[in-house]
Amino acid sequence: GIVGVNREFTAELAAAVKPIFLEIIMAPKFSEGALEVLCTKKNLRLLEVDMSADKKSHNQYVSVNGGLLVQQLDTTTVALSEDMCVTEKKPSAEQMIDMQFAWRIVKHVKSNAIVVVKDGKTLGVGAGQMNRVGSAAIALKQAEETLAAEGKDIRKEGLVMGSDGFFPFGDSVESAAQFGIAAIVQPGGSVRDEESITAANAHGIPMLFTGMRHFKH
C-alpha cells in the first residue's frame, strides 16, 4: 500500500505503520527516529515531498487523442453553514462538523463520489461509478462492514454522507435512509432536487446544499 501525510513523519507514526505492508510513504519530512524504524523494512520507498504553497501546481494535464487538455485544478471549497440546510430538520453541531469533514474528503475522490463518515473518520468510499446510486451502495456497504467488524450496527451509528455532485433522483437518499444515514451534504442543482428533499424530510434526515460541486475525473 501507499501512505501519505502532510506533516513530519515521526518515530511514533513509523512504529504504528511498521506492521503494515507498505511500498511507498510520502511526507514533507522524516524524523531521524522514523528513518531508523522504517529503514528496517524491505522494499519500502520513502519520498520527501515539498508541500510549500509556491510549489503547488494550479493546472491539471490530461492527454487526449491528438492533444493535451489543460484545466485548472479544483483547489477551492466552501465552509458549510446551517443556512445551506434545505430540509425541515436541521443538523446538530456534531453533524455539521462531520458534514464539513465529508465535504472535504469527497472532493478528492474520483467521480461519481460518495463518502460515509463519523467522528472525523472515513468509513466508506464509493468512487468512479457510472451513476451516483452505485457509488452510494459501495460506500454504504463498506461502512457497514467496517462497523460490523467492530461489533456495531450501521443503522445505530448516526453516520454522515457526502456527495461530490447532486443527486439526480431521490433514490440515493432512500438508500442512505435504509442504512441509517443521519445527515447528508451534497451540491444540489438537479432539476429534481425536490425528490431528494422530499425523501430526506420523510426520513427525518437533515441535508445541506453547498451550491458547489467537486467533480474529479
Segments predicted by a language model, with ranges:
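ATP-dependent carboxylate/acyl-activation modules
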Residues: G1-H217
